[in-house]
Amino acid sequence: HYGDSYDWLSGGEWDTVMNYDAFMEPVTWFLTGMEKHSDQYREDMLGNADNFFGAMHHNMSRMGGQPVSISMNELSNHDHSRFLTRTNSTVGRIATKGAKAANENVEKCILREAVVMQMTWPGAPTVYYGDEAGMVGWTDPDNRRSYPWGKQDWELIEFHKDMIRIHKKYECFRSGSYKSIASGSHWICYGRFNKKLQAVILINNRRETLTVDLPIWQIGILENACLK
């Protein structure tokens, strides 16, 4: 859904939405600096943690708790450029750049960061066919290319499987509470938790190693606890 969905989600109509405002857009801006159609690049949005959490919290509050918990959280779909193509920070479409350019200078490490967020953020993670295999493409219709049979990125497929297993294994990622914990330039930290389990997710979108002290007590982790 494009725009504020409050009126549709206030009762008697929709249960939830395809979650652009409280997932796809904030994640894309933060990790790539790109607009979701690859129509604009904004350096001021790349790694902007304040904008990320601000957009997420505002739009999640407009949706409400239950719609957020079952929202369709996608990185790509049939209406927008493939997330992997957005990682090249190139503005363009099939008519202006051509098909090959959609695969130039892409960064699969950024896609993996996005998948971690997709599998740990509140909502229902929804993988658009081929994203798990490393498919690229500009916005519609280039985003609807055939599945790359025989050319799949098997390492990326296995990464998706691992993250899906984690999502399924730990209930806190499916129905637990959420809290932002800390953030800085090009990094964010948030928690998912319930009465039995607490999980801390740290996303570092820098080029270098990051060492930070985190107030994880905010989600109920004791001072001398040992994290796996």
What label would you give each PLM region?
Residues W217-E223, K228:
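C-terminal beta-strand-rich structural cap/linker in extracellular carbohydrate-active enzymes
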Residues H1-Q66, S71, M117, G134-R165, ...:
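Active-site-proximal helices and loops of the catalytic beta/alpha 8
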Residues P125-Y129, E171-S177:
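Acidic/polar loop patches that form or flank catalytic/metal-binding clefts of enzymes
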Residues H1-G3, N77-S81, A133-M135, H186, ...:
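Short, solvent-exposed loop/turn segments at secondary-structure junctions
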Residues I181-I219:
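Carbohydrate-binding surface patches
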Residues A49-T139, W154-E155:
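Substrate-binding clefts and catalytic carboxylate motifs of secreted carbohydrate-active enzymes
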Residues V116, A124-P125, R145, Q198-V200:
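Residue-level detector of short, conserved catalytic/binding motifs and their immediate flanks
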Residues Q118, G130, M163, V200-N204, ...:
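Hydrophobic, well-ordered secondary-structure elements that form the walls
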